[in-house]
Amino acid sequence: MKDLLNLFNQQRQTLDFDAIKIALASPDLIRSWSYGEVKKPETINYRTFKPERDGLFCAAIFGPIKDYECLCGKYKRMKHRGVVCEKCGTEVTLAKVRRERMGHIDLASPVAHIWFLKSLPSRIGLMLDMTLRDIERVLYFEAYVVTEPGLTPLERRQLLTEEQYLTARQEYNDDFDAAMGAEAVYELLRTIDLQSEMTRLREEIASTGSETKLKRLTKRIKLIEAFLESGNRPEWMVMTVLPVLPPDLRPLVPLDGGRFATSDLNDLYRRVINRNNRLRRLLELNAPDIIVRNEKRMLQESVDALLDNGRRGRAITGTNKRPLKSLADMIKGKQGRFRQNLLGKRVDYSGRSVITVGPYLKLHQCGLPKKMALELFKPFVFAKLQRRGLATTIKAAKKLVEREEAEVWDILEEVIREHPVLLNRAPTLHRLGIQAFEPVLIEGKAIQLHPLVCTAFNADFDGDQMAVHVPLSLEAQLEARALMMSTNNILSPANGEPIIVPSQDVVLGLYYMSRALENKKGEGMVFANTSEVKRAYDNRVVELHAKVKVRITQVDVDAVDGKRTSGTSIVDTTVGRALLSEILPEGLPFQLANTEMTKKNISRLINSSYRLLGLKDTVVFADKLMYTGYAYATRAGVSIGIDDMLIPDEKKGILTEAEAEVLEIQEQYQSGLVTAGERYNKVVDIWSRTSERIAKAMMDTIGTEKVENAKGETIDQKSMNSLYIMADSGARGSQAQIRQLAGMRGLMARPDGSIIETPIKANFREGLNVQEYFNSTHGARKGLADTALKTANSGYLTRRLVDVAQDVVITEIDCGTTEGLIMTPIVEGGDVVEPLKERVLGRVVAEDVYLPGNDEEPIVTRNTLLDEAWVAKLEDASVQSVKVRSTISCESSFGVCARCYGRDLARGHQVNIGEAVGVIAAQSIGEPGTQLTMRTFHIGGAASRAAAVDNITVKTTGSVKFNNLKSVAHASGSLVAVSRSGELSVLDGHGRERERYKLPYGATITAKDGDAVKAGQSVANWDPHNHPIVSEVAGFIRFIDFVDGVTVIEKTDELTGLASREITDPKRRGAHAKELRPIVRIVDGKGNDLTIPNTDLPAQYLLPPRSIVNLQDGAAVGVGDVVAKIPQEASKTRDITGGLPRVADLFEARKPKDPAILAERSGIISFGKDTKGKQRLIIKDTDGSEHEELIPKYRQIIVFEGEHVTKGETVVDGEPSPQDILRLLGVEPLAAYLVKEIQDVYRLQGVKINDKHIEVITRQMLRKVEIVDQGNSKFLNGEQVERQRVIEENARLVKRNELPAKYDPVLLGITKASLATESFISAASFQETTRVLTEAAVRGTRDNLRGLKENVIVGRLIPAGTGLAYHAGRRKASGLTDSEMETLSGKPAGAEPVAALADAGADEE
C-alpha cells in the first residue's frame, strides 16, 4: 500500500515545475539516459515474437514485455520486483518502462547533427566562420581542412583539395594536421576558445566599417554568447553517441498473416546500426581509405535521415515509395506531436448527434436523448444504484443498466439534475461555440437546442451535428455553471451587443403582432388595462392590428439605487403591442416595445433590458419573447406565392431609357470620342444606376398599398405583402434578394471579379433567357469556389491571431500609465460613421475631460470607466475628443492591466484579473472572417461613380470649419485650396462635428472659415476628372522648354476651336530631348521671376507628362487661376484589395506594392536633376539641411515645387506602408491607421468589432524594439529585443548611473511576432518547428511557461481565469519567496545569473 502512495507522490513531483529548458545533449548525458547499447539491427524473432538480444527491442536494455515477468519466464509476479534475471538479463518491473527507457548507439565515427548544420543559418558554419558549402565538402569527404597549422604558412580552417593536401604533406611533412569528414569538424569545434574568440570579435566590431561584415560579426557574437551563457559546448553539435528512442514509442506490431506493421523509425535505426557495425568492422580490418570514407559518408547520411529525412538530398523512401517519417517529422506540422496530440486531444465522456429545435426549452436547457445520457453518465448511475442498494456490485449495476430497467431511468433523472453538460458545434470559431446547458431527458435520438443560442453557435437544423461533453469534477461543474452557462453569455465578446437575439420565425411573429393597420375591427376603442385587451381579442371584438388606446402601468427603476416607482398613463398603441407589453419585465419602458418589432428593435429591447434590469430578468424576458414570437408566427400564417412578387409598372420605361443611353455611348465610342475603357465604365454605371431605380420602384410597389381609413379617405400604408414583411422585419431576405425576384437581376460579375457589361434585365419571376442564365451561372460558381477557399483562409488567419495574442492576460488592475489614444468620432464624407459615444463606451479615461472652452471643472475625471450614463453625459456636453487608455500604451510588464483594457464586453463591467483578453481578441477578429469577401475589387462601375464627386453639399445647418487647409484667395472672392490634406467640417450649434469632407487640391471654396451654412448649401466644387495646377501668384506666363512636336503637342478642340498643348511622355522623345523639362514660370511685367509667398523659391511649376496647358505664352494669370490640368483617368485603375486578404495584409504588416512615399522630415519641396528612370525630390528643412529621395518616373508625385510638407505627409500617391507610419509618425498614428483600415473592411460587411480587439493584436505586433545605440547594455546594435527586456535592463543601468540603450519600436507581422515570442514551446508549436527548436537548443533557452499555449502543451491548467489563482496558490505552496518567483517568471535575472547575484550582494551592503 505504501508503495502505491509513493508512486502517486512521484507523479505529483513531475508536475510541479516552473520552467522547461532545452539544450544540446553531451555524449555523457546521452549515455547517462541510456540503459544499454543497441548493437544489432534485429528487431523481434519472427517465430517466437520475442525481441532479439541487443537488438532494437531488446528486453535487457528497454525492460520486460509483460508486467513483472522476465523474458525467459524464470521470474514472474510482483514478489520478484526489481530482480535482474541472470539468464536473459531482463529486469522484472512494469512493462510501461519500455515507453521511457532509452538506449544508445556508439558511433564508430562522429556525425554532424543535420539540424545544426543545415537549418539556416547554419550554426556550425557560424561557429567556424566557414560557409555551409565548405563544411559540406569536408563532411562528405571532398576536401581536407587544416585543423592545426603548426608552424607552416597554412591557415587554420583552410580547405585543401586532394592534390593540395599531398603537395603540402610532401613540403611540410608532419608539421601540420589536416583531416576530412566529421572528425575534422569535431576537432575544429573542440579547439575553439569561446572566451578569446568573443574578445577578438568585439574588438573587430569596433574597428569595422562595412555593413555586411558587421551583420556577420553580430550574428557570430550572439551565437558565441549563447554558447557561453547556456553552458553548451560547440563540439556537441557533432554527435559521437546517438540516443535510441524507447521501443514502445516506435512500436512493431505483428499483423495476421505473418506481416508486421512498424514505425518508420525502426527502419531508419536499422540503417544506422547496419552501417555503423559495417564501419566498425572495416576499421578493425584496416580497410582501404576509400572504402572507409564511403562507409562514413553513408553513416552520416543515414543519421541525417533518422533525424530529419529529406533535409539533405533525396528523402529515403520505404517499400512503397513513400518518404520515411523521421524524428523531426514526428513533431512538426498539423499531424505532428504538438498540434495533433498536445494542443488538441480526443476527449472521453463525450458523444455527438444531430440537433433539432427545442422551442419549448428554457434558455439554460438542452434536450439530451435518454440513450446518450445513460451512456455518458454511466459511472454516476452505477454509483447511485450501488448506494441505493439496487445493485450489490458494479457488475450487477452494469447488468441493470444494460437491461434498461425502469428504476435506471429514475436514477438517471436524479444524476442529471443540475449537472450541466457542454455542447459544442464545430467549427468552434469563438468562445460561444462551446456553452453549458442543463440537460432535459427526451425520447428520440437527436439533441434539442434552444433556438436563441443558434446565432452564437452559428447552427441551423439542416443536419448540423453537435458534441456533448460531461464536466466530471466539482470544479469543472462549477465553472460550467458560473462561466459557460448559456444564460451567462447574453452579450457577444466581440462587440458587447446581445447575441441572444430572436431571428427568423420569432422575429416574423413579433413583427406581425406589432404592426399597426388602418381601419381594422375595434379601431379607436379604449381599454383600462392589458388584460381587458386580451379578453377583447380572445372574444374577437378587436383585431390584432387595430389601433387602440390602453392604460398602461409603467414601473421606473432608478439606475443608481434600484428604487422602483410606478405610474399609469393612457397610450396610443395597437392590440398586438398591448399584448406584447404583458411580457415586458417590470422597469422596461413600454415605448421601447411600442413600435414595429423589427430585428433591430428587438435587439435594442434586449440590450436595454440587460443594461437596466440585469441578467436574470433579461433571460426570462428573452424566453418569453421567443414563445410569444412562435405563437403569433403560427397565427399569422405568412406564406409567399409567386403573386407576391409584384413587378413595378415603371420597369419597362426605365429600361428603355437606359438602353437609349447605352446606345448613345456606343455611338460616341464608334466616332472616337470616348475610349474603350471609358465606354465600359459608363455603360456599367448606367446599368447599376438603372438597377437601383428599378429596385426603388419595386420596393415602393411591394411596400405600400392603398387603403381606406376610418374617415373614408384613401391613404398609403405599409403593405402586408408577405415578401415585404419578411424583408422589412429582418426575418429573412433582404432588399437585394427581393430585387432579383421582382425587380431586375442586375449586373453580374465574371469569376475574376470584373463586371459583365450586359446586365440581366429580367427577374426570377419573369424568368431568364438562355444567355442571361449562362451569365448568371458564371458568377454563381465563382461564389461557391470562393466560399470553400474563404473558410480555409479565415481559419488560418484565426490561428495566426490566436498564436500571436495567446499570452495576453489581464495581470493587474492598473499599470499607472498616463498615455492613451485620442478618440474622435469617425466622420466620412458627411456621415458620422461611428459617433464618439460608441468609440469610447467601455473605455477608461486617461486624462480629465473638460467642457469645450472651459478648463475649470472636469466633466469626467481620469481613470473613470465610461458606461452608458457617462457617455450620454459626454454627448450632451458635446465633447469632441477624449483621451482614453489603450492596451497599446499599457505599461504592464507581462499581459495588460484592467484599466487599459476597460470593460469586459461580454459582462458589461470592468474586466477581471485573469481574463484571457488576447484569445478573445483573436477570436473576435477571426470569427467573422468567413463573412468577409475574398476578392480584390477593381475600381470601376459603382466604385468609380462614387469617386466622381465634384462638390460638397452640406447636410446639416451649422458653421464651417477648415482643418489643415492652405488656400489662396481668387479674384472672384472665393478661396482655392492649395493643400492636399485639407478638410472641411460642419459643426452644429454646440460645436459638435457633424460632417467632414476632404478638400482636394484646386477645389474652389465658396464659404469662409466660420461661416454659417444651411443644409443643402454647396460650399465647394472642383473638376473630378482633371487635377489642376494652381498659380499662387499673379503675373504673366513664361513657357520654358516648350518645343512643339517634341515636348508638347498642340491640339485644337473640334467643338470649341480652342488650342491647347499637351506635354508628351519623355519615354517617347528622342535622346536629345530627354533632358528637356517643360516648366510654366510666372514672371512680373518686366520679365523678372516671381517667388512663391513665404519662400525663396521661384514661382514655377514642373509639368508632368500628359498635362494640358490651355493658356498661351505671355498670358496674364491671377492668384488661384488654373495654369495647367492633368487628366485623371490614369490613377483610377488601381485595384483595391478587399475583404479577408486586406485584413491579413494589415496584420502581417506587409508593405504594399507601390507604397506611398511619406515626407521624411518637414520642409519645402523642390525638384533636383532627374536620373534615367527616376525623379529627384528634395525636402529642404528650416535649418537648411536637405533630404533627397529618388522616385520612379511612373509614380505620381502629388506635391509641387515650393509646397510646404510636414513630416509623415504623403508626397507620392499610394497605399501607405505601416512601417513608414511607425517610423515617421510614431505608435499612436500607426495604431489609429491599423484600427481604421481593419474596421473599414469589417464595416463594409456590416460586422461590428470593438476597436480594443484590434489594439490588443497591434500591441503584440509592437512587442519588439530594435536597439539603435547599445549604451552600456548587454544588447548589440541592430538587435531585436522584447521591449520589456530593454526597459528592465535600462532601469538597471540607470540605477548604476550607466548609459541606457536607445531603441526604436519595430512592427512585426503576426506570423513573425508569434515566432519571435519568448516561449520556444509556443513558437515551435506554431510554425517552423525545426528552426525554433534548433535556435532554442543552441541558446539553452528556458521557457518559463507564462503563456497559455505552453501550459496546455505541458498539460497544466492555463494561467488565466480560474487557473491564475491555481498557479498563484501552487507557487505559494511550493514555498518560494517573491523574488525567487520573479526570477522564475522571467524577470531580468536568469539571463545573467552572475551579474544578478553580484547585484544582490551589492544591494545588501
Curated annotation (Swiss-Prot):
Domain of life, source organism: Bacteria
Ranges for region Disordered: 1375-1405
Cofactor: Mg(2+); Zn(2+)
Enzyme Commission (EC) number: 2.7.7.6
Catalytic activity of the protein: RNA(n) + a ribonucleoside 5'-triphosphate = RNA(n+1) + diphosphate
Gene3D superfamilies hit by this protein: 1.10.132.30, 1.10.150.390, 1.10.1790.20, 1.10.40.90, 2.40.40.20, 2.40.50.100, RNA polymerase II, clamp domain, RNA polymerase Rpb1, domain 3
Protein task: DNA-dependent RNA polymerase catalyzes the transcription of DNA into RNA using the four ribonucleoside triphosphates as substrates.
Protein name: DNA-directed RNA polymerase subunit beta'
